[in-house]
């Protein structure tokens, strides 16, 4: 099968035209000391995990701020999830050439497991561009949230995206390529993942 182009510039242009302005980034300590007497702000900081038990990095040499460890594709017609182990560079590279079969009209969703380190990440989003036969057919842009660095009591975060229904019909069947990105409010892209699915007949 010929490799499809991953040029999704038309979608990128839409995002780059966004006029939303992001405030200056603060360190973990700055957030912890911010308006200490403000009760509502204190609750917001607590919801981000900004407590006194924030621990040093497990791997001090790792400069990544968002580490996506695993993605699971949950399909209602399959007994077990399809799991992408993203801690392995070889697995990440192999995903681009694989196509995971999903039956038409199936209900599916993604579960993302990740950790945050070094600093608070705000406005993390999962952005996915989808092509079929070289033509851009869809874009997904889901808000994941804002997160403080993980601790021993919270070693990772887990987020499930909304359910979707696989297309059906003769024209809808076939191979779809996807490019997934994890982008924050600073427009930092923490991971780009190339993968794909094949929609098959029931």
Swiss-Prot record:
This is Rho GDP-dissociation inhibitor. Disulfide bonds: none annotated. It comes from the Eukaryota. The keyword Translocase does not apply. InterPro entries: Ig_E-set, Rho_GDI, RhoGDI_dom_sf. Signal peptide: none annotated. One of its GO terms (molecular function) is Rho GDP-dissociation inhibitor activity. It comes from Saccharomyces cerevisiae (strain ATCC 204508 / S288c). Belongs to the Rho GDI family. The modification N-acetylalanine is found at residue 2. It is found in: Cytoplasm. The modification Phosphoserine is found at residue 40. Regulates the GDP/GTP exchange reaction of the Rho proteins by inhibiting the dissociation of GDP from them, and the subsequent binding of GTP to them. GO terms for biological process: actin filament organization; regulation of vacuole fusion, non-autophagic; Rho protein signal transduction. One of its GO terms (cellular component) is membrane. The keyword Protein transport does not apply. The modification Phosphothreonine is found at residue 27. Present with 1670 molecules/cell in log phase SD medium. Pfam families: Rho_GDI (PF02115). The gene is RDI1. Keywords: Acetylation, Cytoplasm, GTPase activation, Phosphoprotein.
């Amino acid at each position: 099968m010929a490799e499809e182009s991953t040029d999704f510039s038309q979608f990128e242009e839409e995002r780059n035209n966004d006029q939303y302005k992001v405030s200056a980034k603060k360190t973990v300590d700055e957030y912890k000391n911010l308006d200490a007497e403000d009760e509502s702000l204190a609750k917001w900081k607590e919801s981000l995990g900004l407590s006194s038990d924030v621990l040093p990095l497990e791997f001090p040499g790792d400069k990544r701020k968002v580490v996506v460890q695993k993605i699971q594709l949950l399909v209602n017609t399959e007994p077990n999830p399809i799991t992408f182990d993203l801690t392995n560079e070889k697995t990440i590279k192999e995903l681009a050439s694989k196509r995971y079969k999903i039956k038409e009209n199936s209900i599916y969703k993604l579960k993302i497991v990740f950790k945050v380190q070094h600093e608070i990440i705000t406005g993390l989003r999962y952005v996915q561009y989808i092509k079929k036969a070289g033509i851009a057919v869809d874009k997904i842009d889901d808000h994941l949230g804002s997160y403080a660095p993980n601790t021993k009591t919270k070693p990772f975060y887990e987020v499930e995206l909304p359910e979707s229904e696989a297309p059906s019909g003769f024209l809808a069947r076939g191979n779809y390529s996807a490019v997934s990105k994890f982008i924050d409010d600073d427009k930092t892209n923490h991971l780009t993942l190339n993968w794909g699915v094949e929609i098959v007949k029931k």
